[in-house]
UniProtKB/Swiss-Prot annotation:
Residues 1-19 form the signal peptide. Keywords: Secreted, Signal. It is found in: Secreted. It comes from Arthroderma benhamiae (strain ATCC MYA-4681 / CBS 112371) (Trichophyton mentagrophytes). Its main location: secreted. This is Uncharacterized secreted protein ARB_07466. One of its GO terms (cellular component) is extracellular region.
Length: 245
């Protein structure tokens, strides 16, 4: 048995074949940086996969790559991003595989937003807003909390227990900010999803009841932790703002 193992190892070494690892690197189509993950995870995140590039792994694990993300970026391991400018939430796979952007592109562009004062907006909501903003510098343009409606109501805003994080330029328009560049739809989608999933993953420190983004909702008492694409779909309320885009 020992001899058989040695011979097998020698053959693999001489042929240059190395067993791949789950969530490990691989070379995708046309030489693109790839990651060995399940085909379902790959396609859900907008990637494409090829066969026979993750040797030694189960048949459902393929080499997944995504050659376009953000503004002129591509997906690769953060350790291989020469610009050092990476953005999470745009690529398939674990957090170590992110969108690698040019040095002058991507990232947050908003000045620090005004945090609501504790009062009609309750301390729990204010503290949560502070934590979210601190974790996502430059991504939040404005914060809303209290709404002029009776409490209790069907909205936590009426009682000052919910906050809305605005992550595009005003009213959903992608206008130029006077000294902070341009925030486009790609930033809305990237910033929003990153923050929404961060809120889900930090639900305990935020004392979270639920989080809504992109016409989907996640509730810690009802739902399992999962990517935003698997959250429960909500009804169409007729506008970008009402649908929480």
């Amino acid at each position: 048995m020992k001899l058989t193992q040695f011979i097998s190892y020698a053959i693999l070494s001489l042929s240059g074949v190395q067993a791949a690892t789950l969530n490990g690197p691989c070379t995708g189509a046309r030489g693109a940086p790839g990651i060995c993950i399940s085909t379902s995870s790959c396609t859900k995140a907008g990637g494409s996969y090829i066969s026979n590039a993750c040797p030694g792994l189960p048949i459902g694990i393929k080499c997944c790559s995504k050659t376009s993300c953000g503004d002129g970026g591509n997906c690769r391991f953060t350790s291989a991003c020469s610009s050092g400018n990476t953005q999470a939430g745009l690529c398939p796979g674990p957090s170590s595989f992110q969108c690698c952007l040019p040095k002058a592109s991507g990232g947050g562009k908003f000045p620090p937003p005004k945090i609501p004062a504790v009062g009609r907006c309750k301390k729990t909501a204010v503290d949560g807003a502070k934590k979210i903003v601190a974790a996502h510098p430059g991504m939040v343009r404005e914060i809303f909390c209290i709404r002029d409606c009776p409490c209790p109501s069907n909205s936590e805003h009426c009682c000052g227990l919910a906050t809305d994080m605005m992550c595009t330029s005003e009213a959903g328009e992608y206008s130029k900010l006077t000294w902070h560049g341009i925030v486009k739809k790609r930033d809305r989608d990237a910033f929003g999803r990153v923050m929404a999933e961060w809120v889900m993953n930090h639900r305990k420190i935020l004392n979270l009841k639920y989080v809504i983004w992109g016409q989907r909702i996640w509730n810690p008492s009802l739902d399992k932790v999962s990517p935003w694409t698997n959250w429960r779909q909500m009804e169409d309320r007729g506008s970008i703002t009402q649908n929480h885009w």
